[in-house]
């Protein structure tokens, strides 16, 4: 389910046509019916702030989806988002991935550096999956359902990607002497 954001203003900005309350009710109904929900979230959408990212992480934890995916907003040429980001000078570069298929942030809003967005993707996963309820669910599946082979592969892939994201965040921080200084356009 594409929840995108847990911040009402961000949902309005992207013209989602849904509300936080409606999304929460949908997830609850699915859980009550025993349906598995995979939640998709995007950080760096138009108008994103540190507070709206925090709202989204907190919102995701209340939904208690079986699994989540956290993506980074990308402004593709020919889209309304691209025109908005380009005209406001928010595009720091045209590089949306690192060559290995990993997403890279390329939109920087005032007070929201690209390396912060990357770090928050990393934190989002940590805060979501390392909660007692989420950890218990994984252990329960491994022990009770004997789903060990699949979970082992998924856990190994998750931890590898987590290490890669952590490395990218550290490299981005070290490349910028003052983390409060915005990245230069075209870099």
Model-derived features with residue positions:
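AMP-binding (ANL) adenylation modules
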Residues: 73-75
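Radical SAM enzyme core and accessory elements
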Residues: 80, 90-187
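Conserved non-cysteine loop/helix-boundary elements of the Radical SAM core domain that shape
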Residues: 1-66, 80-87
């Amino acid at each position: 389910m594409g929840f995108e954001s847990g911040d009402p203003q961000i949902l309005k900005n992207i013209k989602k046509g849904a509300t936080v309350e409606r999304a929460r009710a949908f997830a609850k109904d699915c859980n009550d019916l025993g349906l598995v929900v995979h939640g998709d979230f995007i950080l760096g959408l138009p108008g994103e702030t540190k507070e709206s990212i925090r709202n989204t992480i907190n919102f995701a934890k209340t939904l208690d989806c079986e699994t989540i995916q956290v993506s980074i907003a990308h402004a593709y040429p020919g889209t309304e988002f691209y025109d908005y980001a380009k005209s406001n000078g928010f595009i720091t570069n045209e590089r949306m991935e690192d060559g290995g298929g990993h997403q890279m942030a390329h939109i920087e809003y005032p007070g929201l550096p690209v390396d912060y967005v990357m770090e928050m993707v990393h934190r989002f996963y940590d805060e979501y999956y390392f909660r007692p309820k989420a950890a218990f669910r994984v252990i329960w599946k491994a022990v009770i359902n004997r789903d060990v082979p699949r979970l082992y592969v998924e856990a190994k892939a998750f931890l590898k990607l987590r290490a890669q994201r952590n490395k990218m965040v550290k490299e981005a921080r070290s490349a910028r002497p003052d983390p409060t200084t915005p990245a230069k356009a075209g870099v």
